[in-house]
A protein has these predicted regions:
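Bacterial Sec-dependent N-terminal signal peptides
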Residues: 1-25
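Beta-strand-rich, non-transmembrane domain signature
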Residues: 20-266
Length: 267
């Protein structure tokens, strides 16, 4: 009970700390304790997988990536002892904002994020110049919960011709003022709640389509801006089949664009 009380209080504090992320950085109670049979055999469970984006008039976005992962067994402990996140330095910059470990015995550990590493991402055959950030967590035990936030700025999905700039201009998309994203809604581990929220200037329009599945969506006005929120709950891992096409063509995904037509993004 001590562990549950500490974790619940910490989640409330975390939700408040996220500020602009609001709804997208809240999570429900831990269902692995309520329905253990549903998650038996899985190495870890994502209690929350959330991304909140604030889009600037230029089309550049500020991303808040929140994830809360519960370790279920020793395999999950080994798999999560190091956190990694990939990004493209041509279009974005990413860094760990905070990492907190809620131990099964009730201890709470806040890691020193100044110890994070940023290095060239491992690659073979073709080297695109991608980078990776990493935080070493160390020893974990079954029942431990990892709660972390990554802040990223920039954009995704564009064909570029120039090199890496040294100023903020590299975070502005080639189609200046336009925002575009493809968001996978499939998972490799059970996920209790997945949220994608994008906040855009009032004068911008946004079209979206959810493929190979369904989610709950809403659009609200917040502080003179439009906020689109997409939520999916109780997601189980997508099963692959022999000779199956890529999951982008078979599993649930969200596509968003501020351009009047999808085709405009391909020009």
């Amino acid at each position: 009970m001590k562990y549950l009380s500490i974790f619940a209080s910490a989640l409330l504090a975390t939700a408040s700390a996220y500020g602009q992320s609001g709804e997208s950085c809240r999570t429900a109670s831990d269902p692995t304790l309520q329905k253990p049979e549903l998650y038996a055999g899985y190495d870890c469970v994502n209690l929350l997988d959330s991304t909140a984006v604030t889009v600037q008039p230029t089309g550049s976005g500020s991303f808040t990536v929140c994830k809360i992962v519960k370790v279920m067994n020793t395999r999950g402990a080994v798999a999560n002892r190091i956190l990694k996140y990939d990004y493209d330095p041509l279009t974005a910059h990413a860094e760990f904002h905070r990492v907190t470990i809620y131990k099964a015995n009730g201890d709470v550990i806040n890691l020193d994020i100044t110890q994070q590493q940023d290095y060239a991402a491992p690659a073979r055959a073709i080297y695109w110049g991608a980078r990776q950030i990493m935080m070493e967590i160390g020893r974990l035990d079954p029942g431990d919960i990892i709660d972390y936030q990554i802040n990223k700025k920039g954009f995704t999905y564009a064909l570029l011709t120039g090199g890496i700039g040294n100023d903020e201009s590299r975070f502005i998309p080639p189609m200046r003022g336009q925002f575009y994203d493809i968001v996978p809604f499939w998972t490799t581990e059970p996920t209790v709640r997945k949220v994608y929220k994008v906040n855009i200037p009032m004068e911008k329009e946004m079209q979206f389509q959810f493929y190979q599945g369904e989610c709950t969506s809403s659009m609200r006005y917040e502080d003179g801006r439009k906020a689109y929120t997409f939520v999916s709950t109780d997601i189980m891992p997508t099963r692959r089949e022999p000779n199956m096409v890529d999951l982008f063509d078979a599993a649930p995904k969200l596509m968003m664009s501020s351009t009047p037509r999808w085709q405009d993004k391909s020009l």
